[in-house]
């Protein structure tokens, strides 16, 4: 992998891995496949996700199939989730506080306990705004919930329609 790890550690090699790409609607298709993998109990030693792959891939590690579709359907028409109004009011097309904090912590609970207990290595990829290079961060048990959510947000950030 080209890029650097923000912790300064060497990126470890995995036995079996899953790459979850970004790309908005492609990410939803990917999550349908990942839900089936979860339901069939097909798991990997490690995975890496960028953008939608990071945002939705965390549900694979937390063993919550169907969660992405459920909250997408539930909040699709809520301006706080994704809208021009959200962009004008918060600076984010996808409301960052709503999507990365209120939904997983209050409205459609993310299973942080299972996520952190799962031994599957999960790498998040974001872009360094100064160099344009990929920055890799492994989501580990010691990572604070807020840090995890902010890394997923950074991975999913889109120029012009995101604050950062």
Language-model features, listed with the residues they occupy:
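Patatin-like phospholipase
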Residues: 1-50, 58-164
């Amino acid at each position: 992998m080209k890029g650097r790890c923000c912790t300064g550690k060497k990126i470890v090699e995995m036995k079996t891995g899953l790459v979850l790409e970004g790309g908005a609607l492609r990410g939803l298709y990917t999550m349908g496949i990942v839900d089936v993998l979860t339901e069939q109990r097909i798991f990997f030693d490690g995975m890496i996700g960028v953008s939608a792959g990071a945002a939705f891939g965390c549900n694979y590690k937390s063993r919550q199939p169907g969660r992405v579709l459920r909250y997408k359907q539930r909040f699709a028409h809520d301006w706080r989730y994704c809208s021009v109004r959200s962009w004008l009011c918060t600076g984010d097309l996808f409301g960052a506080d709503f999507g990365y904090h209120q939904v997983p912590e209050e409205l459609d609970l993310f299973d942080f306990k299972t996520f952190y207990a799962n031994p599957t290595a999960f790498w998040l990829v974001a872009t360094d705004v100064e160099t344009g290079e990929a920055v890799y961060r492994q989501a580990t048990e010691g990572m604070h919930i807020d840090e995890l959510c902010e890394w997923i947000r950074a991975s999913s950030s889109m120029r012009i329609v995101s604050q950062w």
